[in-house]
Amino acid sequence: MDQSKGTVRGFGARLVVAVPYLWLVVFFLIPFLIVLKISLSQTAIAQPPYLPVLDLSAGWNGIKTFVAGLDLDNFATLLSDDIYARSYLKSLEVAAVSTLILLFIGYPLAYGMARAPRRLQAVLVMLVILPFWTSFLIRVYAWINILQSDGLLNRVLQAFRLIDTPVAWLSSDTAIYIGIVYSYLPFMVLPLYATLEKMDETLLEAAADLGAPRWRAFWLVTVPLSLPGVGAGALLCFIPITGEFVIPDLLGGSDSLMIGQTLWTEFFSNKDWPVASAIAVVLLCLLVVPMALYQNLQTKNVAG
């Protein structure tokens, strides 16, 4: 009886461990392999709109024909046309600059929240996540009304006589950065707050006892201890911003072509699934790099 209970418990423990891996296989690995397969195919006027299609009913010959029909032409297309390289570089530039802006804005906010009275902290956290209760698309559309020529921002600036004529905020990089910072600020603030809130206050007291002024204690104690939160917040912002489509499409101009817009055009307008899939594969490979670097740093910190 005890042996059977131990067997059941052992199976249950293995099942619990296997569930996350099963989740990754079903919702990440299999979809990625499908996208990778399409990226190695050729565009066709068919359904689905690419060839070759694996025909298992043909047996081994069908598999050989399928493999022989795969090539790297779509990736060569990405290298031959400058528009794709410019889109990737623009996306990485916007993501990097936006992440830095979010860090400079989010760190003081998170620090203030972590130092606020305990009862007030819950209210502040709720205020940070409150925008998520509204549709993302509606929030972006609201910025169109705010940033347009006769919008709220221009009216306020003119009322304070800071500008004489309305500024063309829309269809510019400035509008994109405003929309991104507004939309992704909670993703930076919450990891930073979680890290700063758990910090041991006695470390700052010890630094003060040793004669360190508050600003020096902040840079030597608080900042290093908050780096895991900085890294987590940066990843949570940088990765989705790189593939952002809605904000640059609604707030940006023709000179603000990001890779998400290029992918959407290839997939829906040009109906070129293989090239769109190749764009997605390259984008994923680019985003794996910062994730791997962050994981490597985390491993070194734990080992150290």
Which residue ranges define each predicted feature?
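N-terminal signal-anchor/first transmembrane alpha helix
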Residues: 1-42, 122, 126
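Membrane-interfacial helix termini and adjacent extracytoplasmic/periplasmic loops
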Residues: 6, 62-63, 140-181, 215, ...
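Cytoplasmic-entry segments and transmembrane alpha-helices of multi-pass inner-membrane transporters
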Residues: 12-17, 108-143, 204-205, 218-219, ...
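Transmembrane alpha-helices
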Residues: 19, 126, 130, 182, ...
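Short membrane-interfacial helix/loop motifs at transmembrane-helix boundaries
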Residues: 30-82, 146, 150, 156, ...
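Transmembrane alpha-helix signature in integral membrane proteins
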Residues: 81-115
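Glycine-rich helix-loop "coupling/hinge" segments at transmembrane-helix boundaries
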Residues: 245-273
